[in-house]
Each structure stands twice: as C-alpha cells, then as structure tokens.
C-alpha cells in the first residue's frame, strides 16, 4: 500500500537539466516504451502577474499564440499538427502558461520550430485580436453561467483580499472588454523570453541529438529583462 502513496522514482530519475546561454532551462527524459515525443514549454507568467484593471492578459495571450506568427500564419499551427498526426493544446494558471505538442518520434521537430517562432514572432493583427476577444469573452461568460464557476470565482475573491490570486484566470469581464492589442503586445514582450521559460521534452529520442536541435531552434533568441518579482503580501484574516 505504501508504494501507492509515494511518488514514483521513475518520474524524476534520469531527468537531465540543461541551461542554454540565453537562460532557457531544458529538461529532457528518454522514455523508449513507445515511439512518441511530448514537447511542453512553460512560461513563468500567469494571472498572478496581472495588476487590477489588466486581468486576463495571460489567458488572452495563450489564445493569441495560436493565431499566427511571422512564419506560421493563422491556422497553420493546428493544420501542421493534424497533418503530422499530432495533438496540441495549452493552458493558463495562476502561476504559469504552458503549451504542449505530442508527435510520433520521427516527426516531432516541428514542435521546436513552432515554439521557437512564437516565443518571439507572434503577430497581433488588430482584426484577429478583436475576433479572438469575442471568443474569450464568450468563454468567460460560459464559465459564469455554471454555478460551480461562479462559486469558484467568488471563493477566490473572498479568500484573497490583496494577492492577485483573487482575480479569475480568464480575467474580469470589464478588463477583457476594454483591453487593447497594444497592451497585449507589451505583455507578450515583457514575459515571453527564453530566460523566463522551461522547455520539457520526454519520449523516444537520443538526448544529445535533442539538445543540439533545441540549441539550433532557441539558442539565437536573446534573453529578456528579468521579470519583476511579485511582492504582493496577503494580510492575516
């Protein structure tokens, strides 16, 4: 019974940690049980980084990273994923924003190319931004239509009086409605840098070959300014 209650050693053994010159942390683990590779990049930015009046920026940005880059135009990321038999998705939390791809091990390199490009070259076309804003607002309203969604929002807003954890990850409706594309671009350039990210790759591959590919894809991307520390202190209640 005790083995069921303790973390599996397999989960962390043989994980290799590499840091590129630009600060990108790379965690790799070879798993040869099936011919699949999972590529996941985590940015250290979430709703906790948002000031009141600017909520929802992290989640909205997650949406925009699927809407095109300088190299991959609107719809091409999902199309390439499907054509190569893969899967992709993303999520935003209070503390992180993460994007992942699953591919067969003979064609997963496209994930590196996409992630490297959208780290620095996400396009913010005004028309596309306004269109996606409607999608995000509808997502927000759908969540509030659920009794559990409304309860969670009120619970967090009550539990935290100062800390940004009190704000919903999708943002407050009025903040999302009045947000501008220029604000979203500035937020992107502030937090999406190699030294504010961790790239996790696990699956059927050779580690040395993978690290060489990662360096080719991300190595030339310059570091960004350090993200400002979050100093919000929640008073005793």
Q: Which residue ranges define each predicted feature?
A:
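Short pre-active-site segment immediately N-terminal to the catalytic Zn-binding motif
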Residues: 46-54
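Active-site SXXK
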Residues: 55-69
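M16/insulysin-pitrilysin zinc metalloprotease superfamily fold
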Residues: 68-71, 102-133
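Short amphipathic alpha-helices in soluble, non-transmembrane regions
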Residues: 113-118, 212-218
């Amino acid at each position: 019974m005790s083995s069921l209650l303790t973390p599996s050693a397999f989960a962390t053994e043989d994980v290799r940690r590499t840091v590129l010159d630009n600060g990108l942390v790379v965690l790799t683990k070879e798993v040869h049980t099936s011919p699949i590779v999972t590529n996941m990049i985590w940015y250290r930015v979430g709703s906790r980084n948002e000031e009141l009046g600017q909520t929802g920026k992290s989640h909205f940005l997650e949406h925009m990273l699927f809407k095109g880059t300088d190299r991959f135009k609107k719809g091409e990321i999902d199309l390439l994923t499907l054509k190569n038999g893969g899967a992709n998705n993303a999520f935003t939390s209070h503390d992180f924003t993460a994007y992942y791809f699953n591919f067969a091990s003979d064609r997963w390199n496209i994930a590196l190319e996409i992630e490297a490009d959208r780290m620095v070259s996400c396009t913010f076309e005004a028309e596309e931004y306004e269109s996606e804003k409607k999608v995000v607002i509808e997502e927000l309203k759908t969540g509030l239509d659920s009794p559990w969604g409304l309860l969670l929002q009120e619970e967090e807003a009550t539990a935290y009086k100062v800390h940004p954890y009190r704000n919903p990850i999708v943002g407050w409706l009025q903040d999302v409605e009045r947000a501008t594309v220029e604000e979203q671009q500035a937020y992107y350039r502030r937090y999406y840098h190699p030294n504010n990210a961790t790239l996790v790759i696990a699956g059927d591959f050779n580690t040395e070959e993978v690290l060489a590919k990662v360096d080719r894809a991300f190595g030339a991307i310059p570091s960004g300014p350090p993200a400002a520390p979050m100093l919000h202190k929640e008073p005793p209640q």
